[in-house]
């Protein structure tokens, strides 16, 4: 199927944010289906597990016996922590898959094409391992930079910001995609940072609105019954993930293509070649899909 495609021309910061919003709105149904199919079951697991464990009131436990053995006090929390760890890992993997699948949808839109959510999920699944590796490396690198000094962390995060788009669209390994992002953003640091800041401010606003509604419902539920008062909060968090994750992918995709237009004169011919590679139809000069997730290459490669 074909639809109107975004313009392949240099964009201002405001135009990038506006373009991301328009991309998100144009492909809203497909993007939400992707996020709901992946993240919905994870949220359901979280709800069922938390409901099965039940609420744990630490303050009441300590008041009943202030001199109790700490291990006895914290023992009821162990199942809760295990559930939180499992759902956190699943949420991370799910969010990464949603990002990759969303980028696939949005990249095709630049050629005026619309693909279904099933096809995009297959593309995201094929690129999941290198996406996970890249996300972990970027988080570690940026996190270390933020710990020692705020500026290096922000710098690294910005320079690596289009790694997911490069990884999915050009079928690169994690390390090569990070290097590709660095090359593309070099010389455009401030505009890219500005676009990212504006997009994350929008993300925060939407999250706060949904979270505020969920918190209000939680308070009302707690007054009625403590047993399931946690449900609105968990559901609210899931809705935030489903709604917001594709928008972040939209912003990353817009920035990525803007950089390629500016630096490489990116056009429809090059895009067609990229999309063929993304779908695995063009095997020239490419390693087998899923190989070399770190992007290091074989010992004898040049």
PLM features per residue range, with description:
Residues 11-14, 92, 96, 155, ...:
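Soluble non-cytosolic domains of exported or imported proteins
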Residues 97-126:
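Hydrophobic transmembrane alpha-helix segments characteristic of membrane transport
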Residues 14-41, 115-144, 156-209:
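Interfacial aromatic "cap" segments that immediately flank transmembrane helices
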Residues 24, 28, 32, 73, ...:
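Hydrophobic, aromatic-rich alpha-helical transmembrane segments
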Residues 1-74, 81-85, 89, 93, ...:
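Generic N-terminal leader segments that precede the first folded domain
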Residues 57-80, 116-136:
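Long, highly hydrophobic alpha-helical transmembrane signal-anchor segments
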Residues 34-55, 80-96, 132-157, 195-222, ...:
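Hydrophobic alpha-helical transmembrane segments in multi-pass membrane proteins
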Residues 2, 7, 56-68, 104, ...:
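Juxtamembrane transition segments at transmembrane-helix termini in multipass membrane proteins
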């Amino acid at each position: 199927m074909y639809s109107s495609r975004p313009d392949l021309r240099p964009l201002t910061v405001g135009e990038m944010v506006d373009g991301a919003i328009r991309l998100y709105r144009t492909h809203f149904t497909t993007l939400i289906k992707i996020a709901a199919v992946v993240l919905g079951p994870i949220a359901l697991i979280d709800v069922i597990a938390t409901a099965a464990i039940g609420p744990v009131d630490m303050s009441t436990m300590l008041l009943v016996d202030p001199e109790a053995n700490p291990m006895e006090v914290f023992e009821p929390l162990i199942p809760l922590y295990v559930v939180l760890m499992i759902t956190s890992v699943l949420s991370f993997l799910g969010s990464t898959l949603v990002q990759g699948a969303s980028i696939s949808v949005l990249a095709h839109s630049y050629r005026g094409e619309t693909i279904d959510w099933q096809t995009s999920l297959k593309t995201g699944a094929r690129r999941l391992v290198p996406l996970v590796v890249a996300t972990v490396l970027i988080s570690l690198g940026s996190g270390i930079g933020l710990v020692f000094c705020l500026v290096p962390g922000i710098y690294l995060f910005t320079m690596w910001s289009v790694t997911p788009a490069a990884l999915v669209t050009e079928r690169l390994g994690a390390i090569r995609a990070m290097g590709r992002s660095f090359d593309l953003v070099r010389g455009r640091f401030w505009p890219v940072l500005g676009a990212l800041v504006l997009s994350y401010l929008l993300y925060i606003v939407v999250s706060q609105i949904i979270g505020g509604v969920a918190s209000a419902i939680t308070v009302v539920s707690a007054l009625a019954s403590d047993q399931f008062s946690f449900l609105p909060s968990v559901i609210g968090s899931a809705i935030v993930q489903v709604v917001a994750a594709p928008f972040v992918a939209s912003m990353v995709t817009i920035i990525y293509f803007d950089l390629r237009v500016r630096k490489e004169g990116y056009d429809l011919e090059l895009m067609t070649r990229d999309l063929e590679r993304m779908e695995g139809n063009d095997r020239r000069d490419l390693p087998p899909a899923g190989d070399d997730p770190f992007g290091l290459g074989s010992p004898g490669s040049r």
